Amino acid sequence: MLRKRRIWIGLAIVSLAALAALCAAGGVMLCETSLHVPRKLPPATPSGIAPHWRPVEMTARDGAVLKAWLLSPATANGDCVMTLHGIADSRTGTAGLARLFVENHYTVLMPDSRAHGEGGGAIATYGLLEACDVHQWVDWLIASERPRNIFAMGESLGAAVLLQSLAVEPRFRAVVAESPFANLKDIAEYRVARMLPVPRWLAYTAAKPMVWSGFLYARRKYGVDFRGASPEDAIGSSSTPILLIHGLADTNTPPRHSQIIASKGPRNTTLWLVPGARHTEAFGAAPEEFRHRVLNWLSDHAR
């Protein structure tokens, strides 16, 4: 009896050790693939988006050279909108938004996020460094274009970056964020769990230590603490008006993330949940209402 008990204890220890090793290895792999995303280079020109454009660039505080297109409408209203793309994409991912704004007389800044497209920087940091990049782009816009009002709209990771930037950038008149995550830890655990070929309860149990291991690895190897990548916390001290848009059919980033953000946002935060819309597809699901809500949000907050 005692021998059997020792065998079971030994098996349990070996199993736990194997699970810990698996989670550690999975965390390292998760971290490396998340920090070094495949680059999707933009085309040479923003063909068909705007009648006038020029390439621009600025140098971030850490020395990364960041690049963008500045689009100008035929008749400008004096206001500017910055558009921010999602993960593993480039500035061209916001071409549809840029066209909408240009057609309505806004100047549009379309930057590549760091470690994306033609953007400098070795790694993507999910808002930790990108928030300051947004702040510097606002500095650049004010110095170069002197716009009357500055607005911004981001999609997916771009939306999360935009919301995090509000902790350091108070000069946006209003912003629009579609399909953001509330905090990186929760969305990472959710997405890892969805990838694991095991029952849901076991997947979520395994995802937590795997994500924790990845965060620890990122902190030790790259000096980035992903526990701070949290739009829901970043907006707490902001007074910038926020329009949140989220598709109710979004399984990539569930709508509860925008609901959490809305519950913690400033009093002038509005949440639009779009029936039938999947991840960042509100424009396609409800085009007329999308145009109406987004354009009115900007014009209502212009000065």
Identify the residue ranges that each predicted region occupies.
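An N-terminal hydrophobic leader/cap segment in hydrolases
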Residues: 10-59
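Hydrolase active-site cap/lid region
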Residues: 167-224, 233
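Catalytic histidine-centered segment of alpha/beta-hydrolase-like enzymes
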Residues: 277-288
